Structures are given as structure tokens and as C-alpha cells.
């Protein structure tokens, strides 16, 4: 995968406290991170674009603007032949237009580098490839604009992806590329009313961004995922406009991390497969871009996804509550294509259920989508699905009973784009057998996990 600029060496400061025995100890974990850096600016999709609607072609998804029935109503069609996408950059698609942002060297190509990074990411996990070609008749043209928009699927001519300064986020770039590959918004699924209560303001009632696309014009190939990069925020059309029926997901909607199921959607759509399949663990599957390794759910690593990521903090639970805190990031603001991440792996004896609760979060930016920072406790049985993300103090209730995990070990993911964040949490295992729960599947494949 192509990289832009690199930095390394981050320190995670971690403290653990045995709450029953009042014994404290400190550990410092240094791990090596290599991140690709690009300027990230702006806000969630959906700002200041209505005045430009008259110049927008039909059959295109315009993020956060009112459009009446202009969307191509097929989830995976038309597709790009041989999963090969041609693209070209408009001359203007390079430099950020916002003069108030003082960028250092290479700022004149920052948009192109972000989009190239997003294309490389997709190619690294799918059979889809991208090739720059400014003469072929069927191609994507990246265009600077004041609105963020893309056609859905391949349209057999030059098709624009409009990408303004305020859309400058890695997940937003992948979002628009997925539209160009033929994938609609998550909240356009025909089963969305099982997961959302939709309460649009009057101006948005006829907006095709919120229309359900029903069979035979759409199919579902993965579970409904509140954390998909193709989902809008809960407040995109006013307070509680897309209200999740699982309210703990309220802040997760609109998150622009790219998920395991996002890439699986592309692989299913384009029938990306390897000649032979590896025995991938924890719900992973053989990477069609590199058939010698598996694509792993967040937090898992190794060739076969049979271990947690190498740089995770390892903790051992007991039958009594223990307390820990962890500090992630630094005092320096970093603008990156990928956040600074930390993983905590809480281990317990075999077949024990782990319980964890967040007691306090500090220096977190509270926003719709938790795009600046967040904490995800991977307590659900399916290791591939996005769990509710916490980034606001009102999401934390130290008096609650906590989360009982259907996974052992239990993973906690903390990520940040903004400065140094601190999380305090308690954990233990309870006298309950994990195997006492029934196993289930996600309804789309045969991988079994505890329900």
C-alpha cells in the first residue's frame, strides 16, 4: 500500500489497579506505528451544498443534499468489467482551497494522495484494481467541488467523483469510491426499518438519500452495520432523524472508519475469490488480493487471524473487579489517514464470561459519528461487526452493570485523531459459562459465534 508521510513511536501509558486488594502497578507500552498522514479537515457529510444543486447531473448520490429520485436503484450494478476501475484527476483536483489551513510541503497534491491511499486500501483487500488512464472513455474523474458526490456503479462514460475540502477524510474517500463501485448507503437497505426509526425534517422527506431500495433492485450480503462507512449520522436531517433501534449505537452512526463488512460487501459484489481458501480464524477469510493471507476482523492478526494484533496490551481478569486506565495519542494534533490505535486484550480462564465497563473518558471530542476519537468494546459474539462506539461523557455510567462479552479474550479498541485521550475501565470474569449460550450465524455465511 502506498504511503504518504510517516511517523512512528507512540507511547501508550497504562495503569492497572486491583480494586479488591488495592495494589497498583504501572507499565509503559511503547509500540511502533507507521501511519500515512494527510490533512483531515471539516465536518460530517452534509454541509453547504444546496446552492450548487443546479449543476449536478442526475443519477448521482450527493451526500447531505436534497435530491429527488436521482439515484441509480441497483446495489451492485452496473459493475466495472474485470473489477478494473480507470480514473483520472482533474487539473483542479490537487490543492486544498482553504487558505486558512497552512500546510507544509506536498500540500499541492494532498487530495490526490488521499484518494490514492483510499484506492490502494480497497485494492489491498479486494480483487478491485485502479489504473490511472485519462484517455479511456469509461473512467472516474476526480473533481474538486463544494459538494461530496458520486455516481452509483459504472455508467459507461466519464463519471465524476466530487470531493471538496470538507470531505477530506479517509473513510469519506472510501465511501465515495464504494458508490462508484455500485454500493448504496446502508440506510437504503430494504431491511433498514428493522434497525432504524426514520424521522426526516420536511425538506428531506423526498430526498432519495433516505429512500429504501427494495428487491430486485438491491440485495443484502452482510448484516446491517450501524458502523459502516456508508451510513449517515443519526442527526443528518435534524435531531434523531436516523434513530437506531439499539440506542447504544446512536453515536456510532456516521463513523468513517472502514469496516470489515464494508470490504466484504465489495468482495461479494465482485465475486472476489482465491483458487483455494485458507482456514482463517475469528471470522476472517482469504484475502483475494493476496491469497497467502487472511483478511482479519479489527483487532486480530497473524496470517490466519488466530491471534490478537501484536501491539495489544494484555490483561488478565480475575473473579473480582480490577481497574485500569490507558492513555492513547500525544499532545500534538496529528492529521492522519488512519487514527492512532491501541488494542487491549482482556483474558480469562477458558469458557468464562468477561465483564467490562467504562468508568471515565477524558479529553474526548464528542461528535456525531465519533470520528475524532472513540472507544469500542468488542463484546458481541460476532468479532466482525462494529460494536457501539463511545466518545461522549454522557455515554459513560460508572454505576451500570457493564458489558458481558461473548468473546474470550475480549478486545477493546481505542482510536484518536486528536491529541491524547484517556480511558478508565473496570473488568472481571463472572461465574457463568460462555458455552451455556447458543451459537448462531449472521444469516449471510456459516461462521458460528455465541449469541
Curated annotation (Swiss-Prot):
The record's Pfam families line, in alphabetical order, gives:
Astacin (PF01400)
InterPro entries in the record: MetalloPept_cat_dom_sf (IPR024079), Metallopeptidase_nem (IPR017050), Peptidase_M12A (IPR001506), Peptidase_Metallo (IPR006026)
Identify the cofactor(s).
Zn(2+)
Glycosylated residues in this chain: 133, 363, 438
Superkingdom assignment: Eukaryota
Q: How is the cofactor bound?
A: Binds 1 zinc ion per subunit.
Instruction: Look up the signal peptide feature and give its range.
Output: none
Please give the SMART domains that the UniProt record associates with this protein: ZnMc
| Keyword terms, alphabetized | Disulfide bond, EGF-like domain, Glycoprotein, Hydrolase, Metal-binding, Metalloprotease, Protease, Secreted, Zinc, Zymogen
Could you tell me where this protein is found in the cell?
Answer: Secreted
Q: Assign the protein's first listed, main location to one coarse class.
A: secreted
List, alphabetically, the GO terms of the cellular component aspect. extracellular region
Catalytic residue list: 176
Give the function comment from the record.
Answer: Metalloprotease.
Entry protein name: Zinc metalloproteinase nas-16
Name the lineage.
Eukaryota, Metazoa, Ecdysozoa, Nematoda, Chromadorea
Point out the gene that encodes the protein.
Answer: nas-16
Amino acid at each position: 500500500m502506498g504511503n504518504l508521510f510517516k511517523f512512528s513511536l507512540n507511547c501508550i501509558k497504562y495503569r492497572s489497579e486491583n480494586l479488591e486488594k488495592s495494589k497498583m502497578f504501572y507499565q509503559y507500552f511503547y509500540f511502533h506505528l507507521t501511519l500515512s498522514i494527510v490533512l483531515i479537515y471539516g465536518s460530517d457529510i452534509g454541509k453547504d451544498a444546496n446552492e450548487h444543486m443546479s449543476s449536478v447531473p442526475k443519477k448521482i448520490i450527493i451526500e447531505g443534499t436534497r435530491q429527488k429520485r436521482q439515484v441509480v436503484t441497483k446495489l451492485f450494478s452496473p459493475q466495472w468489467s474485470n473489477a478494473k476501475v480507470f480514473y483520472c484527476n482533474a487539473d483542479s483536483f490537487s490543492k486544498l482551497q482553504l487558505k486558512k489551513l497552512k500546510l507544509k510541503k506536498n500540500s499541492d497534491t494532498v487530495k490526490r494522495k488521499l484518494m490514492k491511499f483510499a484506492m490502494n486500501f480497497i485494492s489491498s483487500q479486494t480483487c478491485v484494481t485502479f489504473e490511472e488512464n485519462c484517455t479511456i472513455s469509461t473512467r472516474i474523474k476526480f473533481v474538486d467541488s463544494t459538494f461530496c458526490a458520486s455516481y452509483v456503479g459504472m455508467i459507461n462514460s466519464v463519471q465524476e467523483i466530487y470531493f471538496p475540502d470538507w470531505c477530506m477524510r479517509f473513510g469519506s474517500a472510501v465511501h465515495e469510491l464504494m458508490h462508484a463501485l455500485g454500493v448504496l448507503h446502508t440506510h437504503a437497505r430494504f431491511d433498514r426499518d428493522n434497525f432504524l426509526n426514520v424521522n426526516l425534517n420536511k425538506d428531506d422527506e423526498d430526498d432519495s438519500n433516505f429512500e429504501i431500495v427494495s428487491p430486485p433492485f438491491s440485495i443484502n450480503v452482510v448484516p446491517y452495520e450501524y458502523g459502516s462507512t456508508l451510513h449517515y449520522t443519526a442527526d443528518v436531517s435534524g435531531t434523531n432523524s436516523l434513530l437506531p433501534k439499539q440506542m447504544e449505537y446512536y453515536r456510532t452512526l456516521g463513523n468513517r472508519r472502514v469496516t470489515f463488512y464494508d470490504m466484504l460487501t465489495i468482495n461479494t459484489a465482485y465475486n472476489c475469490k482465491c483458487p483455494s481458501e485458507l482456514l482463517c480464524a475469528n471470522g476472517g477469510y482469504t484475502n483475494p488480493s493476496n491469497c497467502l493471507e487472511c483478511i482479519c476482523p479489527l483487532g486480530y492478526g497473524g496470517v490466519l487471524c488466530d491471534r490478537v494484533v501484536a501491539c495489544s496490551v494484555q490483561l488478565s481478569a480475575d473473579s473480582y473487579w480490577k481497574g485500569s486506565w490507558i492513555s492513547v495519542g500525544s499532545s500534538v494534533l496529528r492529521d492522519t489517514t488512519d487514527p492512532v490505535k491501541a488494542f487491549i486484550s482482556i483474558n480469562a480462564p477458558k469458557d468464562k464470561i468477561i465483564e467490562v465497563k467504562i468508568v471515565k473518558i477524558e479529553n474526548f471530542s464528542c461528535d456525531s459519528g465519533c470520528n475524532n476519537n472513540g472507544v469500542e468494546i468488542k463484546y458481541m459474539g460476532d468479532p466482525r461487526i462494529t460494536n457501539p462506539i463511545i466518545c461522549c461523557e454522557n455515554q459513560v455510567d460508572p454505576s451500570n452493570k457493564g458489558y458481558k462479552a461473548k468473546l474470550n479474550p475480549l478486545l477493546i479498541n481505542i482510536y484518536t485523531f486528536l491529541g491524547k485521550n484517556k480511558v478508565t475501565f473496570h473488568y472481571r470474569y463472572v461465574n457463568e459459562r460462555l458455552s451455556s449460550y447458543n451459537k448462531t450465524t449472521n444469516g449471510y455465511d456459516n461462521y458460528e459465534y455465541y449469541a
